[in-house]
Amino acid sequence: AAATKGKGDLMSGGSRLTDMDGNRLNHHTGISCMSQYNVVDRGSVVVIDKAFNIEDAALFGCAVMTGVGAVINTARIRPGDSVAIIGLGGVGLNGIIGSKLAGAETIIAIDIDPSKFSRAEELGATHCFDSRNNDMVEEIRDLTNGGVDYAIDLAGVIQAMDTAYQIIRYGGSVVTAGLSPINTQFSFNHSDLVAQ
Protein backbone atom coordinates (compact mmCIF):
# COMPACT_ATOMS: atom_id res chain seq x y z
CA ALA A 1 0.00 0.00 0.00
CA ALA A 2 2.84 2.43 0.76
CA ALA A 3 3.98 2.37 -2.88
CA THR A 4 0.58 3.58 -4.04
CA LYS A 5 0.69 6.71 -1.89
CA GLY A 6 3.36 8.58 -3.80
CA LYS A 7 1.69 7.87 -7.15
CA GLY A 8 -1.85 8.67 -6.04
CA ASP A 9 -3.14 5.20 -6.98
CA LEU A 10 -5.85 3.22 -5.24
CA MET A 11 -4.63 0.38 -3.03
CA SER A 12 -5.72 -2.01 -5.80
CA GLY A 13 -3.69 0.02 -8.32
CA GLY A 14 -4.62 2.73 -10.78
CA SER A 15 -7.55 5.11 -10.59
CA ARG A 16 -11.23 4.72 -11.40
CA LEU A 17 -12.08 8.42 -11.52
CA THR A 18 -11.71 11.18 -14.08
CA ASP A 19 -12.62 14.84 -14.14
CA MET A 20 -15.19 16.37 -16.53
CA ASP A 21 -12.57 16.46 -19.33
CA GLY A 22 -11.60 12.80 -18.91
CA ASN A 23 -8.31 13.49 -17.10
CA ARG A 24 -7.34 10.89 -14.52
CA LEU A 25 -7.91 11.90 -10.88
CA ASN A 26 -5.34 10.67 -8.39
CA HIS A 27 -5.97 9.87 -4.77
CA HIS A 28 -4.30 11.35 -1.73
CA THR A 29 -2.56 8.69 0.43
CA GLY A 30 -4.53 5.86 -1.15
CA ILE A 31 -7.80 6.86 0.52
CA SER A 32 -8.64 10.46 -0.44
CA CYS A 33 -11.19 11.00 2.29
CA MET A 34 -11.22 14.79 2.36
CA SER A 35 -14.81 14.96 1.11
CA GLN A 36 -18.36 14.26 2.21
CA TYR A 37 -18.63 10.98 0.27
CA ASN A 38 -15.78 8.58 -0.47
CA VAL A 39 -15.00 5.37 -2.29
CA VAL A 40 -12.38 3.43 -0.33
CA ASP A 41 -10.90 -0.04 -0.14
CA ARG A 42 -12.75 -2.14 2.46
CA GLY A 43 -9.47 -2.56 4.36
CA SER A 44 -9.57 1.17 5.07
CA VAL A 45 -13.08 1.21 6.57
CA VAL A 46 -14.07 0.95 10.22
CA VAL A 47 -17.73 0.84 11.22
CA ILE A 48 -18.53 3.34 13.98
CA ASP A 49 -21.41 2.73 16.35
CA LYS A 50 -24.10 5.39 15.84
CA ALA A 51 -24.03 6.16 19.58
CA PHE A 52 -20.39 7.33 19.30
CA ASN A 53 -19.82 11.10 18.93
CA ILE A 54 -18.64 11.70 15.34
CA GLU A 55 -16.32 14.56 16.38
CA ASP A 56 -14.54 12.23 18.79
CA ALA A 57 -14.40 9.50 16.15
CA ALA A 58 -12.60 11.86 13.76
CA LEU A 59 -9.49 11.71 15.95
CA PHE A 60 -9.16 7.99 15.37
CA GLY A 61 -8.80 8.37 11.60
CA CYS A 62 -5.23 9.62 11.79
CA ALA A 63 -3.81 10.89 15.06
CA VAL A 64 -4.72 7.93 17.26
CA MET A 65 -4.22 5.17 14.69
CA THR A 66 -0.88 6.54 13.51
CA GLY A 67 0.59 7.55 16.88
CA VAL A 68 -0.54 4.54 18.89
CA GLY A 69 -0.01 2.24 15.90
CA ALA A 70 3.63 3.34 15.45
CA VAL A 71 4.30 2.41 19.08
CA ILE A 72 2.19 -0.74 19.51
CA ASN A 73 2.20 -2.31 16.02
CA THR A 74 5.45 -1.13 14.43
CA ALA A 75 7.92 -0.58 17.28
CA ARG A 76 6.22 -3.20 19.48
CA ILE A 77 7.17 -1.41 22.70
CA ARG A 78 7.20 -3.73 25.72
CA PRO A 79 6.95 -3.09 29.46
CA GLY A 80 10.19 -1.59 30.77
CA ASP A 81 11.39 -0.24 27.40
CA SER A 82 12.64 3.30 26.93
CA VAL A 83 11.10 5.30 24.09
CA ALA A 84 11.51 8.80 22.70
CA ILE A 85 8.61 10.39 20.84
CA ILE A 86 9.83 13.15 18.54
CA GLY A 87 7.15 15.64 17.56
CA LEU A 88 4.26 16.47 19.88
CA GLY A 89 1.43 17.26 17.51
CA GLY A 90 -1.73 15.14 17.56
CA VAL A 91 0.08 12.06 16.28
CA GLY A 92 3.01 12.47 18.67
CA LEU A 93 0.80 12.95 21.72
CA ASN A 94 -0.95 9.72 20.79
CA GLY A 95 2.49 8.11 20.55
CA ILE A 96 2.96 9.13 24.19
CA ILE A 97 -0.38 7.52 25.08
CA GLY A 98 0.58 4.35 23.19
CA SER A 99 3.93 4.20 24.98
CA LYS A 100 2.21 4.43 28.35
CA LEU A 101 -0.34 1.78 27.34
CA ALA A 102 2.52 -0.51 26.26
CA GLY A 103 4.20 -0.13 29.65
CA ALA A 104 7.31 1.80 28.61
CA GLU A 105 9.31 2.75 31.69
CA THR A 106 10.97 5.85 30.27
CA ILE A 107 8.92 7.98 27.87
CA ILE A 108 10.82 10.96 26.49
CA ALA A 109 8.88 13.70 24.69
CA ILE A 110 10.86 15.88 22.27
CA ASP A 111 9.62 18.98 20.47
CA ILE A 112 10.72 22.41 19.35
CA ASP A 113 7.82 23.98 21.30
CA PRO A 114 8.11 23.61 25.11
CA SER A 115 4.50 24.75 25.56
CA LYS A 116 3.51 21.20 24.53
CA PHE A 117 5.41 19.57 27.40
CA SER A 118 2.74 19.90 30.10
CA ARG A 119 0.21 18.03 27.93
CA ALA A 120 2.83 15.37 27.10
CA GLU A 121 3.45 14.86 30.82
CA GLU A 122 -0.29 14.64 31.52
CA LEU A 123 -0.48 11.85 28.94
CA GLY A 124 2.48 9.88 30.30
CA ALA A 125 5.81 11.45 29.32
CA THR A 126 8.40 10.97 32.05
CA HIS A 127 10.87 13.51 30.60
CA CYS A 128 10.62 16.38 28.10
CA PHE A 129 13.35 17.92 25.96
CA ASP A 130 13.46 21.02 23.77
CA SER A 131 15.01 19.88 20.49
CA ARG A 132 16.73 23.27 20.12
CA ASN A 133 18.88 22.50 23.20
CA ASN A 134 22.41 21.80 21.94
CA ASP A 135 23.04 19.37 24.81
CA MET A 136 19.83 17.38 24.30
CA VAL A 137 21.40 14.31 22.67
CA GLU A 138 24.05 13.99 25.38
CA GLU A 139 21.47 14.53 28.14
CA ILE A 140 19.18 11.82 26.73
CA ARG A 141 22.06 9.39 26.30
CA ASP A 142 23.11 10.05 29.93
CA LEU A 143 19.53 9.68 31.20
CA THR A 144 19.09 6.33 29.43
CA ASN A 145 22.57 4.89 29.99
CA GLY A 146 23.56 5.08 26.33
CA GLY A 147 20.36 5.76 24.43
CA VAL A 148 16.71 4.80 24.14
CA ASP A 149 15.47 1.41 23.00
CA TYR A 150 13.15 3.09 20.48
CA ALA A 151 13.12 6.54 18.91
CA ILE A 152 9.92 7.31 17.05
CA ASP A 153 9.76 10.23 14.60
CA LEU A 154 6.22 11.54 14.45
CA ALA A 155 7.19 15.00 13.22
CA GLY A 156 8.13 14.21 9.62
CA VAL A 157 11.12 16.55 9.39
CA ILE A 158 14.77 15.75 8.70
CA GLN A 159 15.87 17.11 12.08
CA ALA A 160 13.56 14.64 13.83
CA MET A 161 15.06 11.68 11.98
CA ASP A 162 18.55 13.01 12.72
CA THR A 163 17.68 13.20 16.40
CA ALA A 164 16.19 9.70 16.35
CA TYR A 165 19.40 8.14 15.05
CA GLN A 166 21.53 10.09 17.52
CA ILE A 167 19.62 9.06 20.66
CA ILE A 168 19.12 5.30 20.16
CA ARG A 169 21.25 2.81 22.06
CA TYR A 170 23.39 0.28 20.22
CA GLY A 171 20.89 -2.19 18.79
CA GLY A 172 18.04 0.28 19.26
CA SER A 173 15.35 0.93 16.67
CA VAL A 174 14.11 4.00 14.82
CA VAL A 175 10.51 4.12 13.63
CA THR A 176 9.07 6.92 11.54
CA ALA A 177 5.45 7.69 10.77
CA GLY A 178 5.85 11.44 10.32
CA LEU A 179 4.92 12.61 6.83
CA SER A 180 7.53 14.71 5.04
CA PRO A 181 7.01 16.46 1.73
CA ILE A 182 7.11 13.81 -1.02
CA ASN A 183 10.64 14.57 -2.33
CA THR A 184 12.32 14.91 1.07
CA GLN A 185 15.61 13.01 1.22
CA PHE A 186 17.20 11.79 4.46
CA SER A 187 20.82 10.69 4.57
CA PHE A 188 22.99 9.22 7.29
CA ASN A 189 26.52 7.95 7.72
CA HIS A 190 26.42 4.31 6.66
CA SER A 191 29.08 3.26 9.17
CA ASP A 192 26.93 4.72 11.97
CA LEU A 193 24.02 2.56 10.81
CA VAL A 194 26.19 -0.56 10.75
CA ALA A 195 27.63 0.29 14.19
CA GLN A 196 24.15 0.66 15.66
What residue spans do the PLM features occupy?
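Short, hinge-like loop/turn segments at secondary-structure boundaries
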Residues: 124-128, 146, 192-195
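Short SAM/SAH-binding signature in class I
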Residues: 146-152, 172
